[in-house]
């Protein structure tokens, strides 16, 4: 087998270093719309936490579909738009989003990374562990911000804080939005995970 990894950013080099012991892994510093892989050549595809950071997510999904063989599975994760959350939760998110847009995402890379690490230490970690304690006590923690991180490592929190606050462009989608984009891209048999983080789904190229 052969694993083809594609990323337009320098993150591709980190992936390469992590997988360097595998001689069947190949790396392409390319965008999906200009990818050098042949069309309809791939047995499967996945995109986890990338396509919500680009301007035209619909087109990007179509570009992914072009590279897949008929019947190939495609695993996708996109930020969801908090469609099932209460008004207070959404208000808190909007306030943090303003901080991201107006301040943090505009900082130089090193300062940005430091600020996001501080956010992970002072906000992500305490709220996550508070949610864990409440869960142990038998309380429902679904509507507590960052409760999804209650069983995750600090490394994940730190990485996600940078991904969340360090990027200038972030899009969010409802389950219906994602379903429509996948169907418009030629996918069917779409199944969504009922577990957080939302939305993760598997579909197949028709």
Locate each region found by the language model.
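A short acidic, Gly/Pro-enriched loop at the edge of an enzyme's catalytic core
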Residues: 33-45
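Conserved class I S-adenosyl-L-methionine
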Residues: 73-117, 121, 133, 137-138
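Short, glycine-/aromatic-enriched active-site segment of Class I SAM-dependent methyltransferases
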Residues: 46, 79-96, 148-168
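A short SAM/SAH-binding and catalytic strip from SAM-dependent methyltransferases
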Residues: 43-57
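Class I SAM-dependent methyltransferase SAM/SAH-binding core
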Residues: 1-35
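C-terminal lobe and adjacent flexible extensions of AdoMet/dcAdoMet transferase-like proteins
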Residues: 145-206
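A short glycine-rich, Lys/Arg-flanked "PGG" loop and its adjoining helix->strand segment in the class I
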Residues: 58-73
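Short conserved AdoMet
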Residues: 20, 55, 69
């Amino acid at each position: 087998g052969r694993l083809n990894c594609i990323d337009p950013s320098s993150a591709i080099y980190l992936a390469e270093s992590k997988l360097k012991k595998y001689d069947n892994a190949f790396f392409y510093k390319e965008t999906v719309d200009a990818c050098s892989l042949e069309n309809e050549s791939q047995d499967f595809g996945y995109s986890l936490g990338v396509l919500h950071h680009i301007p035209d997510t619909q087109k990007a999904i179509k570009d992914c579909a072009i590279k897949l063989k008929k019947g190939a599975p495609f695993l996708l994760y996109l930020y969801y738009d908090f469609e099932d959350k209460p008004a207070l939760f959404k208000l808190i998110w909007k306030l943090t989003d303003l901080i991201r847009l107006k301040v943090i995402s505009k900082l130089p890379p090193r300062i940005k990374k430091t600020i996001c690490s501080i956010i992970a230490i002072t906000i992500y970690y305490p709220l996550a562990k508070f949610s864990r304690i409440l869960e142990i006590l038998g309380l429902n923690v679904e509507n507590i911000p960052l409760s999804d991180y209650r069983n995750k490592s600090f490394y994940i929190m730190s990485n996600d804080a940078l991904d969340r606050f360090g990027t200038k462009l972030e899009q969010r989608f409802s389950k219906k939005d994602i379903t429509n984009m996948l169907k418009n891209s030629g996918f069917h048999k779409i199944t969504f995970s009922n577990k957080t983080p939302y939305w993760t789904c598997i579909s197949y190229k028709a």
